[in-house]
Amino acid sequence: MKGDVKIINYLNKLLGNELVAINQYFLHARMFKNWGLTRLNDVEYHESIDEMKHADKYIERILFLEGIPNLQDLGKLGIGEDVEEMLRSDLRLELEGAKDLREAIAYADSVHDYVSRDMMIEILADEEGHIDWLETELDLIAKLGMQNYLQSQIKVTD
């Protein structure tokens, strides 16, 4: 089915956002793991996998609309050097992605591409959940102090 060119362009932009997020969150997860912060590792790793699933949805939709998925035009990763910087970098990425999603959703609705719109609304709900988690973690750092926060991110195994 031949899709609207602007929808395909939006989907490719959103795909690019997801590809950056996959790599950024995966690297952050492994850095957290290396530092012994297993709870942060677990969440970031899960988020990386979720972003991969979102990317897969975009790829399938672009192909269905007879477009070509662009997996080469990647933005810059925002890799932090400490926990707070990493969480802030992830939050910036999520906020930008949510902004792009809202714009694409509005356009899809205006051209009556309800399937693309509904897919993007579902993904936006996931992104808003991640934004909420990141904001909560940054609030905890501010309230508890970094040392107490870091201590709370260590999972003792049997």
Curated annotation (Swiss-Prot):
One of its GO terms (cellular component) is cytosol. Its cofactor is heme b; Fe cation. InterPro entries: Bacterioferritin, Ferritin-like, Ferritin-like_diiron, Ferritin-like_SF, Ferritin_DPS_dom. Coiled coil: none annotated. Homooligomer of 24 subunits, arranged as 12 dimers, that are packed together to form an approximately spherical molecule with a central cavity, in which large amounts of iron can be deposited. PANTHER family: BACTERIOFERRITIN. This is Bacterioferritin.
